[in-house]
Regions:
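Positively charged n-region of N-terminal signal peptides that target proteins for export
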Residues: 1-8
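C-terminal motif of bacterial Sec signal peptides marking the signal peptidase cleavage site
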Residues: 16-19
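Core dinuclear metal-dependent hydrolase active-site scaffold
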Residues: 28-32, 37-88, 123-186, 201, ...
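Active-site metal-binding motif and surrounding structural segment of the metallo-beta-lactamase
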Residues: 74-75, 80-126, 185-192
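Cap/insert and terminal regions of metallo-dependent hydrolase folds
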Residues: 176-256
Length: 257
């Protein structure tokens, strides 16, 4: 009898130990699964940050605000647009030339301590088109002008290359330039063409320029007389013809990708 009881006690002990061991294994598996889930969630968040796209806000007329993937803020030709649109602190301010409708820097009251301002003077230093690399963006000055209102020696356009390789061409105030055909080799993502037809090229010439530049997307801007107080005219914008055309209303935002 004692022997039988000893056998039963041994069996119960083994069963109990096995049960405890199984529970430990389950706990370990559960902990491993939780760690894996947390790692996957963290990786997903990092991927989302890595794939965050820059945005472009069309302020109207020739004025644009770009917010990079790093949350750096670039203003180009400040003039048109609500004051609220100029609220984000500037990291970089670009001006294509000195006409009043491209240099209202006072609209940008909020600037980071290391904010830089590049006007046509810096962009054309030494009579050469300059390139500036800020890490979050590379800015290349290119030709602009070629009409009686805009001297090619006093005006520039810009090509902005963002991290990730997205490129944005801003014609500035100009007519057709000798450099435009060569820009096709750059395979630009976005190209903005002025088309007011008063001081610069009209929509027909701007459409021809878009055919020369061959950007993935071409966008009309600077389409009215600055003195009119109207800084977007859809009827003019729709006369601009180009492959991959995008029409941005004043105050409309575009994700750059």
């Amino acid at each position: 009898m004692k022997k039988l009881l000893l056998i039963l006690l041994t069996i119960c002990t083994v069963a109990l130990l096995a049960a405890c061991g199984g529970s430990g294994s389950q706990d370990e598996d559960q902990a491993a699964n939780q760690a894996q889930a947390q790692q996957s969630e963290q990786t997903e968040e990092e991927t989302q940050m890595d794939t965050k796209n820059a945005t472009l806000l069309y302020l109207g007329h020739g004025s644009i605000r770009i917010t990079t993937a790093e949350d750096k803020v670039i203003y180009i030709d400040p003039f048109a647009g609500d004051d609220d649109w100029y609220g984000p602190a500037a990291d970089l301010i670009l001006s294509t030339h000195d006409h009043y409708d491209h240099v209202v820097f006072d609209k940008i009251g909020n600037r980071n301590d290391d904010c830089q301002v590049i006007t046509r003077k810096e962009a054309l230093a030494g009579g050469e088109h300059q390139t500036f690399d800020f890490g979050y963006a590379k800015v290349e000055a290119v030709e602009a002008g070629y009409n009686k209102n805009h001297n090619v020696k006093e005006c520039v356009g810009y090509i902005i290359t963002l991290t990730g390789g997205v490129t944005v061409y801003l014609s500035g105030d100009t007519s057709t330039t000798a450099q435009m055909p060569s820009l096709a080799e750059r395979n630009l993502d976005y190209a903005f063409f002025c088309c007011d037809g008063i001081y610069n090229m009209d929509t027909a010439e701007a459409s021809s320029c878009a055919a020369l530049v061959k950007a993935k997307h071409s966008i009309p801007y600077h389409m009215t007389d600055a003195n009119s107080g109207v800084y977007f005219d859809r009827s003019v914008a729709e006369q601009f013809e180009a492959d991959g055309r995008i029409i941005l209303e004043q105050g409309e935002e575009l994700e750059l990708q």
